[in-house]
């Protein structure tokens, strides 16, 4: 679930960015994927409220509800309005995150087409190949932007994408943001302990 509220897991990222512990790098593909999910979620919210209104009106009349102070029209949300409000929350979060956003100029289409026909990750033989193209683009962006020498943390729970990023020991994968946060906190604690011993 996407949650950009003050105490959410995602908002902790902003704290780590502001303290200089991490720098966020996102593929423009990831940004577009998040926007797509936000739009879909806002549509689902509006549909759920409309459904709730419909169910309530099966139980009692609109007139009775109005007499007791329940305004069922409040449940008729404007889909476009709430999509835009939801996207505004995302844009504000992104602004506070201040990420480097990798664009498509880093992508080498020849490499991706070769990987596709050679069935190299993320194009593994048992999966629907067409759906793996976004992962291939993201992995290609990571390889082009960071190479194999720069140490980077990648939050990803997709084995095909992990393999496609290459086998660099400097690419450290975490399945969740929580795992990344724990690693940062452990490293920070170890650093403080070493510093205190000196």
Task: Write out the residue ranges for each language-model feature.
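Active-site-proximal, substrate-binding regions of enzyme catalytic domains
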Residues: 2-151, 159-198
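Conserved nucleotidyltransferase catalytic core and NTase-mimicking acidic/glycine-rich helix/loop elements
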Residues: 154
